[in-house]
Amino acid sequence: ADTIVAVELDSYPNTDIGDPSYPHIGIDIKSIRSKSTARWNMQTGKVGTAHISYNSVAKRLSAVVSYTGSSSTTVSYDVDLNNVLPEWVRVGLSATTGLYKETNTILSWSFTSKLKTNSIADANSLHFSFNQFSQNPKDLILQSDATTDSDGNLELTKVSSSGDPQGSSVGRALFYAPVHIWEKSAVVAGFDATFTFLIKSPDRDPADGITFFIANTDTSIPSGSGGRLLGLFPDAN
């Protein structure tokens, strides 16, 4: 199975797998059952921003999700990613819809990793930034239903030609280049990721959510990982 660390923007509470009974931001370490969550006042039809950061000195993974003009949601979890993830990983975004649906539109995405060893400063760092997405992106690995549209957006899950979200959809987008996320001799390792998103839904209960995730380089969408499993995990254990 893949080794996954993720920050989930979970729009639909699945209390049967340990979700709180409201939309939430969660930190997932090798399981869909979040280690830490915070209530998320999700706003459909508004552009939101998610910022995720990790620092190997503090050994803390944190996320802040906000909408312009309203308060932000913050969640963090203390974890040493050296003990969780392989040394080389890929970073990605995933989303799903189920019986209920929503658009999972990504407008921009940037990522910077910092890996400083005593001998070489920043030689192993990686930076990318998408302010829009090209029609046939060579620098993204698109999995299942994920596509880029003519407006320069990344649609992680299926939308109709008129832009309406479709149910039972799963999609992921990964940056093509592997990231050197840690090294034994590193003085400091860390990363910052930011993406802007737009969730729209005709349903009273939008579903299911968007994640930023880090995984082994050969990661693929597990069978049966749709809906509440957010395209990341084969089961709810």
From Swiss-Prot:
SUPFAM superfamilies: Concanavalin A-like lectins/glucanases (SSF49899)
Record keywords, A-Z: Calcium, Lectin, Manganese, Mannose-binding, Metal-binding, Toxin
GO MF entries: carbohydrate binding; D-mannose binding; metal ion binding; toxin activity
Complex formation: Equilibrium between homodimer and homotetramer. Oligomerization is pH-dependent with homotetramers forming at pH 6.5 and above.
Residues that, per the record, bind a carbohydrate: 12, 99-100, 228
Positions of Ca(2+) binding: 10, 12, 14, 19, 208
Family: Belongs to the leguminous lectin family.
Pfam assignment, any one: Lectin_legB
PTM entry text: The beta and gamma chains are produced by partial proteolytic processing of the lectin alpha chain by an asparaginyl endopeptidase. Mixture of 60% alpha lectin and 40% of its beta and gamma proteolytic fragments.
Role: D-mannose/D-glucose-binding lectin. Has anti-inflammatory activity in rats. Induces histamine release in mast cells from rat. Induces lymphocyte proliferation and IFNG production.
Miscellaneous notes: Binds one manganese (or another transition metal) ion and one calcium ion. The metal ions are essential for the saccharide-binding and cell-agglutinating activities.
Residues annotated to bind Mn(2+): 8, 10, 19, 24, 34
Protein name: Lectin alpha chain
